Amino acid sequence: MKLNKRHMSKKHPPELDTKIPVRPKTLVFVSHDSRDADIAEAFANLLSDVSAGTLKSFRSSDKKGNSGIEFGAEWYTSIMSQLEDATDVVALLTARSIDRPWILYEAGVAKGKLETTVLGLALGVPLDKVSTGPFGQFQNCGDDEDSLTRLVMQLLQRNPDASPRETLNKSIFATRRRLAFES
């Protein structure tokens, strides 16, 4: 957070500038357990749908499209490159993935080395279960409709080219039901 210098006097204490930074090019890295590939795909599709395709994402398990690791590519190098390019990392925290070392590693690299925003999304597990260990330092998101809507809106606000479509709440509700069913 940056200090707002316009009120730096003895009469007025400094204010914190808490605005969400707008990024010129947004890439959301969707960190997930490979067994949750369908959930990661549903979340990536949600981001694309509500932003009319302007909010791009990467998920290593993508086998259908072009947002995964290409055949023949060195997977570790590809993942590290995408983490470096990411403006945000959304870690999908499910019963299968909470304690998986790879999700912890990706979140650690993103936050510790690259200073990238890490957002934990608890899917099918209580927030208090995911808000321990390394994810205890983050304000994590639950899978209820209001929280999921707020998370998606936060990601959209960081992208100057994205404007949420009117179907945002409908898309989130449908995706939330699918995510709850699959997790």
Language model features with spans:
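Conserved TIR/SEFIR loop-to-helix hotspot centered on a Trp-containing motif
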Residues: A95-K113
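C-terminal interaction surface of TIR/SEFIR-family domains
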Residues: M1-V28, A37-E41, N45, K56, ...
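Arginine/glycine-rich "motif VI" loop of SF2 helicases in the C-terminal RecA-like domain
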Residues: D49-A52, G108-V118, G124, V130
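Short, well-ordered beta-strand core segments
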Residues: V89-V90, N140
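Generic beta-sheet signal
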Residues: L92, L121-L123, D143
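Conserved N-terminal substructure of TIR/SEFIR domains
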Residues: K2-D88, K113-T116
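Short amphipathic alpha-helical segments
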Residues: A42-A44, N66, W102-Y105, G133
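Short beta-alpha junction loops
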Residues: K63, A95-R96, A122-D128
